Amino acid sequence: MSFAAYKMMHWPTGVENCASGYITHSLSDSTLQIPIVSVHDDIEAEWPNPKRGIGPLPNVVITAANILEVYIVRAQEEGNTQELRNPKLAKRGGVMDGVYGVSLELVCHYRLHGNVESIAVLPMGGGNSSKGRDSIILTFRDAKISVLEFDDSIHSLRMTSMHCFEGPDWLHLKRGRESFPRGPLVKVDPQGRCGGVLVYGLQMIILKTSQVGSGLVGDDDAFSSGGTVSARVESSYIINLRDLEMKHVKDFVFLHGYIEPVIVILQEEEHTWAGRVSWKHHTCVLSALSINSTLKQHPVIWSAINLPHDAYKLLAVPSPIGGVLVLCANTIHYHSQSASCALALNNYASSADSSQELPASNFSVELDAAHGTWISNDVALLSTKSGELLLLTLIYDGRAVQRLDLSKSKASVLASDITSVGNSLFFLGSRLGDSLLVQFSCRSGPAASLPGLRDEDEDIEGEGHQAKRLRMTSDTFQDTIGNEELSLFGSTPNNSDSAQKSFSFAVRDSLVNVGPVKDFAYGLRINADANATGVSKQSNYELVCCSGHGKNGALCVLRQSIRPEMITEVELPGCKGIWTVYHKSSRGHNADSSKMAADEDEYHAYLIISLEARTMVLETADLLTEVTESVDYYVQGRTIAAGNLFGRRRVIQVFEHGARILDGSFMNQELSFGASNSESNSGSESSTVSSVSIADPYVLLRMTDDSIRLLVGDPSTCTVSISSPSVLEGSKRKISACTLYHDKGPEPWLRKASTDAWLSSGVGEAVDSVDGGPQDQGDIYCVVCYESGALEIFDVPSFNCVFSVDKFASGRRHLSDMPIHELEYELNKNSEDNTSSKEIKNTRVVELAMQRWSGHHTRPFLFAVLADGTILCYHAYLFDGVDSTKAENSLSSENPAALNSSGSSKLRNLKFLRIPLDTSTREGTSDGVASQRITMFKNISGHQGFFLSGSRPGWCMLFRERLRFHSQLCDGSIAAFTVLHNVNCNHGFIYVTAQGVLKICQLPSASIYDNYWPVQKIPLKATPHQVTYYAEKNLYPLIVSYPVSKPLNQVLSSLVDQEAGQQLDNHNMSSDDLQRTYTVEEFEIQILEPERSGGPWETKAKIPMQTSEHALTVRVVTLLNASTGENETLLAVGTAYVQGEDVAARGRVLLFSFGKNGDNSQNVVTEVYSRELKGAISAVASIQGHLLISSGPKIILHKWNGTELNGVAFFDAPPLYVVSMNVVKSFILLGDVHKSIYFLSWKEQGSQLSLLAKDFESLDCFATEFLIDGSTLSLAVSDEQKNIQVFYYAPKMIESWKGLKLLSRAEFHVGAHVSKFLRLQMVSSGADKINRFALLFGTLDGSFGCIAPLDEVTFRRLQSLQKKLVDAVPHVAGLNPLAFRQFRSSGKARRSGPDSIVDCELLCHYEMLPLEEQLELAHQIGTTRYSILKDLVDLSVGTSFL
C-alpha cells in the first residue's frame, strides 16, 4: 500500500457533552404559545383551566467526539386531539403532569473537523419576556473557541465569532509546556454577561458578550435572521491565573445572583495523592473573582481554604440561595460569601482539623467522577460513577444554607454529562450506554403516597427492553416491562423541619449508543445466503462488538445492510412493476378515530403484477391466488401504475393507452388516452403513458411526448374525467418529471408558507365527506421539473404556480421561491452548447417525489433522481423573511406577467434545505424510459420512509425528522417494490429481483434502525472485554467481568502469594474492618449462540476464572496435532493473576476443544490443556499450526501434540506488554503498550523466531494489523494520541538502517482511540482484479471506519480535489480539516511522515456542492466530475463489508 483513503462508515454515538438552551426559538416564543383550537372544539367555549404542564422547553445540544447535534424537545400533552388520533403514539413512560409523551426531534447535525472538548450555552438574558436566543460556545484543542447561533433564514447554525489562542503569537501562554492533560473548559455567566474558557492549565479567557442595542448587533443583522437576535461575543481578553498565585486549577464556575459576573475557581495549592494523604490532605482552595470586563479588573472578593485534596467539581447554586457546591470523593461542601457547611459521604471523610465531626449522610457512597445538575432551586441531581442517581437537598433559611441532605433515588445509565431541560426534564448523556431523556415530577408533602424505593431491577435504563419497542419507530416504542420499570421514585428522609419533596421519574426518549467498542468479531448472519457472490455476499456477515461498561455492558450486533426475513418466494421472470390495492365492499359511515385505526390495519385486497406483455392479478387473502381471468382488470398488456381512489372505495389501473376504474373486481369506467387518430399505429404509439402519480382524487399522467394529463375524480359519483392543464399545454418547455403531493391533515403544512393562504383556503373547514363524517382532505399540489432543470409547484386543480425555482437540478444548498422568466428556457437552450453538454444532460431530473409523513411536527421532503443516478434530498422549512417580500415586489414591478397567474397566495415563506443522504447508490439511467425507483411507505413494521429500488437498493427511514439510509444488498438489483399487509404478512412488503424472483418479506424486528447502521443490542449486564468467532458452529466466545462484593479478609488473602509462604499482615486491622465488603471484578468466558428469531442470545457455556485471575485474551486457533498430523480448532484463553505489588506476575494459558455435533449439548467446550507461565498471557495467535503466546516480556512459540504444549522457539526482545499480535503467513506483527511495533518472521527449518525490523520511536499502541495491497505488505498501528500510522519493511533502502528500522508510509489523525483493526477483502470493481484488503476499525467513541488502499492515479486525483475543497467549502465552526488530520505527537520531537492518505470526510462535501461548482472544481484539477464521482462510488462499493 503506497496510498490509501480514510473513510468513516459509522459515526460516533457516545455522548460526551450535553447542554440545553433556547437555540432555535426564544423563551418568549415558548411561553406565549397560543393553544391550537381543534376543528372539533367549540370556538366560543371558555379557555380550559390552567393545569400543571411541562413548561417552556429549550433545545438539547449534544456532542459525541466530532459530531454536533441540536434537538428540539416535543411534548405531547393529554387531550391534544391531533396526537390522540394516531393509535401508534402509545408513548413510553405513561402520563405525568398531563404529558403522555416527550421526544427529541433533530434540528441539525454536523460532522466537525475537530473533537469538541467542552460545550456551553451562552444565554441571552432578559427573563421570560426576552425575544433573544441563546448561542452555543464550542471549544477545541488546544485553544480554539467558536460561537454559533441558529439562523432561521438558512435553518442551520452559523458562526458569529471565532477566538484562537494558538500559534507563534500565543506561544508564551503555554510557558514551555507542550502537552496538557485536558482541552479548553468553557463555562458561562447565568445571566449571559460573559463567558470564561480555561486553556493551557492556568490561562482564563474572558469572553465579553455584546449587549442588545450596542453597535455590534445592527438592525440589518436582526432583520436578516427573521427579527431575532442571539447572544454574541463582542471581545475577549486573558487573565493569567498564575499572577493571582494559582497553581493547579481543577474547575471553575460562574455564580448566580451577583450584580457583576463572579467566577469561583477551585485550585490545589500543592499536589498530593493517596499515598501522602496522612501527611498532606486538605490542599484545595476556593477563590471568588468579581469580573469587570470593561475595566478588565478581577479582584478576589471571598475565598475558602482547607478543602479536601480530592475536590474536583463545582456546581453553582441557583438563585435565590446562591453560593457554590464543591463535590469531593468522600464529602460535599457548600460555600458562599456568608455561610458554609459540609456533608460526609463515607468513613473516609475527615475535616481539616480532625477535631470537629462532619455531619454524615444516611448511607455510604463514593462520589468521585460524578456529574450534577439542578432540578429545582434547592435540589441537585447527582449521577455517580456506578450510575446511581442521588438527590442532594439544601435545607436553608432565607439565603443561609443550614445543612445538606442526601437521599438515594434510582439507578440509571453511567453518565458522561447531565443537563436540565426546562423545569420538568433532564438529559443524561452517556458514552457507556444509551443517552436518556427523563421527565421528573416533584410533589411536596409526605412520601407515603408514593410506592417508595423499589428493588434494584426496576431502575431507569435505556436498554433491556429492546425486543418489543423496536417494532415501532424510535419515538413510539413501548417497553416489555411497561411503565412500572421506567418510573423511579425517591424521597428525602423524613425530617420535621423541612418541607418534604418527593420526585418521580419517567424515561421519555433515548438515543442509541454502540460505544465504546473494545473489540469486535466478524461472523456469518443467521439467515446468510450460501450461494451469494460479490457485493451480495458481503451482506452475509455481521459485526459482533463488545461495547458498554458494567451494567450498561452489551453485545452490539451491527449490520451495514438490511437482510429481510423472508416469508415466501416464487420465480417470476420479466416483472416490471408490482402494486397492492385495498378494496372494501361496504364502507362505514363514521369517520372517527376508530375508522382511522381500522384504515391503518386494513388488509390489502389485490396484488397487481405487470409483466413484459401482460398483467397478472392476485387476490391477497389467506393465500395468494391468481384471479387474472375472473376480474375486469386490463390484463392484455403491461400496467404502468395502480392505486386507490375515493377513500379506498375504487381502484384505478393505468396502462399505456388508457385507465380503468374498478370497484373490487368489476370495472366501472374505462378511459382511453393517446392520439386523436387511434386507428393509425404510429399515432397511438407517439403518446403513451410514461409515468403516473396518484393523490386521491387526482391522477397525474406524464405522456411519452412530455405532455401532462390530469385525471380529476368526482367523489360523489366515483368517476374520473380527463383534463389537460392549460398552463402546461401552452408552454414550450419540455417536462422531464412530475409528481403530485398531497398535503394532508387538519392543518396542511404548506398553508403556513403563505401569508394570505389562510384567507384564500379557509382555516380548517370541516368538509363533509361522502361517508357522512367530517373529513380533512388537505391540499394537493403538482410538482413539475423541466428539461432545463427548473422546478415549479402548482396548486391542483386550478394550476396556479405557487412556487418556482430555476436550476433545481444543479442541487444548490438552499431553494427559495424565485419567479422564472420565459427567457430562461431560451437561455438554457443556447448555453447547452457552451458548457459540457453531456454533464448538463445527465443532470436531467428523471423522477420526483414529495412526501410529508405522519406526525404532528413533520415537514415535507422533496426527492429528485437525476439521470446520472444522483439523488437530491430537500427538507422544507418556513422562513418569513423581510427580504423575500422586497425581492418579490421588485420582480413584480419588472415583470408583472410572472406573478399575475399565481394571485396572492404564492408560497412566499417556503424554503428548502438540501440534506445529505449517506448512500453509495449511483446508477445512470439509459436514454429509454426511467423506471420509478422511489416507493413511499407509511407503515412497514411501524416504520415510515421510502424504498429505493435499482442496482444498489436501500431503505430510507424517517426518525426524529432525520432520514436514515440503510442499503439492502443481499439480492442484488431490485426491479419493483410494494407494501403488503395481510393475514400472513403483517405490515410487510414484496419485492422482485432483477433475476425474476418475487419475495414476500418482513423487516427484522430485533434491529434498531435509528442509527447509522441497523443495530441489535444484547444486554449482558457485565463488562465485555474481548470476543472471537467460531465459524463451524456459529458460536461467539467472549470475556466478561462483573463486580462482586467480598469480605475484606478474603480479598486481602488473595493478594499474597500463598505458595511462597507469605502471611497476611493484618495486625493493624480490627475485626470489624476485616468483615467489611470490598468490590472486586470477577472474570469468566461466556460462549453465546445467536438466536434464529432475532431474540436474546443463548449462553451455551460459562467458564469461570479463578480468584483474582483476569482473562486477557480469547481467540479461536487452529493447531496441528503433532501426534495425529491433523488440524484441530481450539479455543485459547490467556489470563493473568492480578495480586499485590510484591507478588511475581504469572498467568495461565488454557485450551478448550469444541464438542462435536453429536455430543451432549451440555458440553459445548471441554478443557484439554492448562498451564501456568511467568508473566501475563496478554495475546495468543496461531501461525502455521503452532501456538504463539506472549508471556510477559517473552514471545514463545509452542507445538501441540494433543495433550500438551512444547516450546520450540522464543523471542526475548524488550516488549513490555504485548497489546496486539497479528499473523500473515510466516510473518508476525507485535504491538507493545509503550515500545511501538515489532516485525518478526518464523522459519520452521531451524525453528527460528527472528526480528526483521521495528519502529525505534516510543509509541503507546492500541491496535495493530497487516494491510495487504496486491503483493505489498504494510503494517498499521493506532496509538494513544488517536493517530493511525502505516509502516513498511524495506531492507534495501538506506534509511532503514540495513533493514532494522520500519519506515513510515503514511500517518493520519483519526480523532478517536482505535481499539481494533480487522483485515477484510475489498470487492473489486470491474476489470480491476487486484487482491486488495482494507482495514475496518472500531473506536472507543462508538464509530467505525476503514483504511482502504488506492492506486496512484485515483489517489492523486482525490488528493488534488481535497486541497481545493479546503477552501471551496465553508467548514462548520471555522475548523481547518488539514490541521485536524495532522499527526499528534503530544509535544515529542519527530520527523513527519508522508502525506499519503486522503480524507473521505472532506471529499464527501464534493457531492453536496451545486453542479456548476462541481464542474468548475473538476476542471481546475484537470479531470471530470464523472471520474471523481466514480472514484468515490467505487470506494463505497469496495468497502461495503456488511
UniProtKB/Swiss-Prot annotation:
A GO BP entry: mRNA processing
Entry keywords, A to Z: mRNA processing, Nucleus, RNA-binding
Listed GO CC annotations: nucleus
Example GO molecular function: RNA binding
Keyword Nucleus carried by entry: yes
Subcellular location: Nucleus
Functional note: CPSF plays a key role in pre-mRNA 3'-end formation, recognizing the AAUAAA signal sequence and interacting with poly(A)polymerase and other factors to bring about cleavage and poly(A) addition. This subunit is involved in the RNA recognition step of the polyadenylation reaction.
Family statement drawn from the similarity comment of this UniProt entry: Belongs to the CPSF1 family.
Subunit structure as annotated in this protein's UniProt entry: Component of the CPSF complex, at least composed of CPSF160, CPSF100, CPSF73-I, CPSF73-II, CPSF30, FY and FIPS5. Forms a complex with cleavage and polyadenylation specificity factor (CPSF) subunits FY, CPSF30, CPSF73-I, CPSF 73-II and CPSF100.
Protein name: Cleavage and polyadenylation specificity factor subunit 1
Protein's organism: Arabidopsis thaliana
Name of encoding gene: CPSF160
